């Protein structure tokens, strides 16, 4: 198969949702259809000992939430599928946002009883900003939920995207009978031995069923007043195809997967800082690091840089340019994933995600190129932390483990590190509280370094240039610190303190982000 044909087979997407909408369960079912797992390990039993394949970190297994984005790959129906499972928890927006830079489409999982929730809305806005297609799976039809028409209306009003139902539920909860499949023009049956039936048989199958009569009325209404189906509008991110189903009972999921792969796009090009778009079908390899993860295998204390291949082909042992440093690197120890399990890979193509073993060479956002190509891809989004804690080792004899742990976890971008200019104390900054809990848990579990963490509350962060820096600017209302790149930064106790500083030093430029 030619390189172009291989690239065109790739489908790389992320799954986004609010916590508990069923995202991990649907991921499991997709892996099941891809032949990667023998049974979908129902995530329901948080005490059952059957853990989701994609939730590999200890704290995720204990709490039943995804806190890092994992990558999984399988072959299905002539396509190579790359799934990026994103954290559903709101505190992990930074990792999630970066992950969404590495995909060509998104699947949005919505709980039929709850509709569009806060985290879904946040993540959707990022996806919308990138103009990538969004496919909606309205989940938990095996339970009582809201009316389908009401859910479609909410999609359009809250998210501002047109919708087109690919199927329609016949009843829900205990009265759930199946799906009226508008796209494939058939009925998908929830009960009994037969999985499908023709629409012509519907009246006979559901004689005297008020839900079926309601479905026919709804469909007539949608055909008259609903949006037109348009493949181009889907690819442009202007229309979301909507599927109903139940991930827990694995109903409607395979039909969803088949239809998703029919319409999901091939790998996209990516913009460089100069505004050029790198064509995925170009023969020269290029890619960018969108995530770094330490200790995916605690036995080996390893670090892996996740790279989205943007163009060309990766071959084991190839040399690449690291644009940020201007130095070369060799990609010899490279892996592909199934959550915590992995295998060495000898080649991969545009659209694929590879993991490069990293001894500290790479940073999130790095661009890799070959030959004379020295461009950089557009920077990934960064977030200014809002809450802070002082951190120190509980046991001074464990200083070495403490420093190693902090260095690795900060390089992942999971948490941000600052050092007090005057006292040398370490301070951690995060977008949400859960990040601190995960940090503490991982320091103790992975680095055997117990830590003492003291809350500092919310702070307003502003960077200043070295040239403007004068230590006398530090006062009781701010803390002067350095970030991990040794850039000076002020942590103001509130917006009033920030305004007071700006009035006192009008010539000093304060930057919101590095």
From Swiss-Prot:
<keyword id="KW-0547">Nucleotide-binding</keyword>
<dbReference type="GO" id="GO:0005829">
    <property type="term" value="C:cytosol"/>
</dbReference>
<dbReference type="InterPro" id="IPR009000">
    <property type="entry name" value="Transl_B-barrel_sf"/>
</dbReference>
<dbReference type="Pfam" id="PF00009">
    <property type="entry name" value="GTP_EFTU"/>
</dbReference>
<keyword id="KW-0963">Cytoplasm</keyword>
<dbReference type="InterPro" id="IPR032090">
    <property type="entry name" value="RF3_C"/>
</dbReference>
<dbReference type="InterPro" id="IPR038467">
    <property type="entry name" value="RF3_dom_3_sf"/>
</dbReference>
<dbReference type="GO" id="GO:0016150">
    <property type="term" value="F:translation release factor activity, codon nonspecific"/>
</dbReference>
<feature type="domain" description="tr-type G">
    <location>
        <begin position="8"/>
        <end position="268"/>
    </location>
</feature>
<dbReference type="Pfam" id="PF16658">
    <property type="entry name" value="RF3_C"/>
</dbReference>
<dbReference type="InterPro" id="IPR000795">
    <property type="entry name" value="T_Tr_GTP-bd_dom"/>
</dbReference>
<feature type="binding site">
    <location>
        <begin position="17"/>
        <end position="24"/>
    </location>
    <ligand>
        <name>GTP</name>
    </ligand>
</feature>
<dbReference type="GO" id="GO:0006449">
    <property type="term" value="P:regulation of translational termination"/>
</dbReference>
<dbReference type="GO" id="GO:0016149">
    <property type="term" value="F:translation release factor activity, codon specific"/>
</dbReference>
<dbReference type="InterPro" id="IPR053905">
    <property type="entry name" value="EF-G-like_DII"/>
</dbReference>
<comment type="function">
    <text>Increases the formation of ribosomal termination complexes and stimulates activities of RF-1 and RF-2. It binds guanine nucleotides and has strong preference for UGA stop codons. It may interact directly with the ribosome. The stimulation of RF-1 and RF-2 is significantly reduced by GTP and GDP, but not by GMP.</text>
</comment>
<keyword id="KW-0648">Protein biosynthesis</keyword>
<feature type="binding site">
    <location>
        <begin position="139"/>
        <end position="142"/>
    </location>
    <ligand>
        <name>GTP</name>
    </ligand>
</feature>
<protein>
    <recommendedName>
        <fullName>Peptide chain release factor 3</fullName>
    </recommendedName>
</protein>
<dbReference type="InterPro" id="IPR035647">
    <property type="entry name" value="EFG_III/V"/>
</dbReference>
<dbReference type="GO" id="GO:0005525">
    <property type="term" value="F:GTP binding"/>
</dbReference>
<feature type="binding site">
    <location>
        <begin position="85"/>
        <end position="89"/>
    </location>
    <ligand>
        <name>GTP</name>
    </ligand>
</feature>
<dbReference type="Pfam" id="PF22042">
    <property type="entry name" value="EF-G_D2"/>
</dbReference>
<dbReference type="InterPro" id="IPR041732">
    <property type="entry name" value="RF3_GTP-bd"/>
</dbReference>
<dbReference type="GO" id="GO:0003924">
    <property type="term" value="F:GTPase activity"/>
</dbReference>
<dbReference type="InterPro" id="IPR031157">
    <property type="entry name" value="G_TR_CS"/>
</dbReference>
<dbReference type="InterPro" id="IPR027417">
    <property type="entry name" value="P-loop_NTPase"/>
</dbReference>
<dbReference type="InterPro" id="IPR004548">
    <property type="entry name" value="PrfC"/>
</dbReference>
<comment type="similarity">
    <text>Belongs to the TRAFAC class translation factor GTPase superfamily. Classic translation factor GTPase family. PrfC subfamily.</text>
</comment>
<dbReference type="InterPro" id="IPR005225">
    <property type="entry name" value="Small_GTP-bd"/>
</dbReference>
<keyword id="KW-0342">GTP-binding</keyword>
């Amino acid at each position: 198969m030619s390189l172009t044909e291989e690239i065109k087979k790739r489908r790389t997407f992320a799954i986004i949702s609010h916590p508990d909408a069923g995202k991990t369960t649907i991921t499991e079912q997709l892996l099941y259809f891809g032949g990667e797992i023998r049974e979908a390990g129902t995530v329901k039993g948080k005490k059952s000992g059957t853990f989701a394949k994609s939730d590999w970190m200890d704290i995720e297994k204990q709490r039943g939430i995804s806190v890092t984005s994992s990558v999984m790959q399988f072959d299905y129906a002539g396509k190579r599928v790359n799934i990026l499972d994103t954290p559903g928890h709101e505190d992990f927006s930074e990792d999630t946002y970066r992950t969404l830079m590495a995909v060509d489409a998104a699947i949005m999982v919505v709980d039929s009883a709850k509709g569009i929730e806060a985290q879904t809305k946040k993540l959707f806005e990022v996806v919308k900003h990138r103009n990538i297609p969004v496919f909606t799976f309205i989940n938990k039809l095996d339970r009582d939920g809201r009316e389908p028409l009401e859910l479609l209306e909410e999609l359009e009003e809250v998210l501002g995207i047109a919708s087109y139902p690919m199927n329609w539920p016949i009843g829900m909860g205990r009265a759930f009978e199946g799906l009226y499949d508008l796209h494939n023009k058939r009925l998908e049956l929830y009960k009994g031995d037969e999985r499908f039936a023709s629409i012509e048989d519907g009246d006979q199958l559901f004689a005297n069923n008020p839900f079926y009569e309601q479905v026919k009325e709804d469909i007539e209404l949608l055909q008259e007043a609903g949006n037109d189906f348009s493949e181009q509008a889907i690819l442009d991110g202007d229309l979301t195809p909507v599927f109903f189903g139940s991930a827990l009972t694995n109903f409607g999921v395979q039909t969803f997967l088949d239809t998703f792969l029919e319409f999901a796009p091939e790998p996209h090009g990516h913009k460089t800082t100069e505004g050029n778009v790198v064509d995925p079908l170009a023969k020269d390899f290029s890619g960018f690091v969108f995530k770094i993860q330490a200790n995916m295998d605690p036995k080996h204390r390893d670090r892996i840089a996740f790279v989205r291949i943007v163009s060309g082909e990766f071959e084991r042992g190839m040399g690449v340019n690291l644009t940020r440093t201007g130095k070369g690197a060799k990609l010899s120890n490279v892996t592909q994933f199934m959550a915590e399990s992995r295998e060495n890979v000898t080649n991969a193509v545009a659209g694929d995600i590879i993991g490069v073993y990293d001894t500290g060479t790479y940073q999130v956002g790095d661009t890799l190129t070959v030959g004379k190509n020295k461009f950089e891809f557009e920077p990934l989004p960064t977030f200014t932390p809002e809450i802070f804690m002082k951190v120190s080792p509980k046991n001074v004899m464990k200083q070495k483990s403490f420093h190693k742990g902090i260095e690795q976890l900060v390089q992942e971008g999971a948490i941000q590190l600052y050092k007090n200019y005057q006292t040398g104390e370490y301070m951690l900054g995060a977008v949400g509280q859960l990040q601190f809990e995960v940090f503490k848990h991982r320091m103790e579990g992975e680095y055997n370094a117990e830590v003492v963490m003291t809350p500092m509350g919310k702070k307003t962060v502003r960077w200043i240039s070295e040239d403007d820096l004068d230590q006398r600017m530090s006062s009781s209302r701010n803390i002067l610190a350095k970030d991990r790149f040794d850039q000076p930064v002020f942590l103001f106790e509130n917006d009033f303190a920030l305004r007071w500083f700006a009035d006192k030093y009008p010539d000093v430029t304060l930057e919101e982000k590095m």
